[in-house]
């Protein structure tokens, strides 16, 4: 699945709530999201207007690995 090109950090954080993540803190221009599904896991997302595709792909890969999904499966759950 092709990744969205104009996704903001806040929109991405909202999408990650669909798979059990929640914002635990925000410091400056970064948000930290945490889930306890399958063990505690943290990801840090820049709160920028538009996330770079490589940044988005890296975070998706990290989350997908933790959840035991492929990156494409996770992208479909979040963006479809």
Give, region by region, the residue ranges found by the protein language model:
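Glycine-rich, flexible loop/turn motifs
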Residues: 3, 41, 74
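C-terminal structural segments of small proteins and small subunits
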Residues: 50-80
């Amino acid at each position: 699945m092709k990744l969205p090109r104009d996704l903001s950090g806040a929109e991405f954080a909202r999408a990650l709530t669909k798979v059990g993540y929640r914002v635990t803190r925000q410091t400056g221009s970064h948000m930290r999201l945490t889930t306890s599904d399958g063990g505690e896991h943290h990801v840090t997302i820049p709160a920028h207007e538009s996330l770079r595709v490589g940044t988005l792909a890296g975070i998706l890969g990290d989350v997908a690995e933790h959840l035991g999904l492929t990156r494409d499966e996770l992208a479909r759950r979040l963006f479809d």
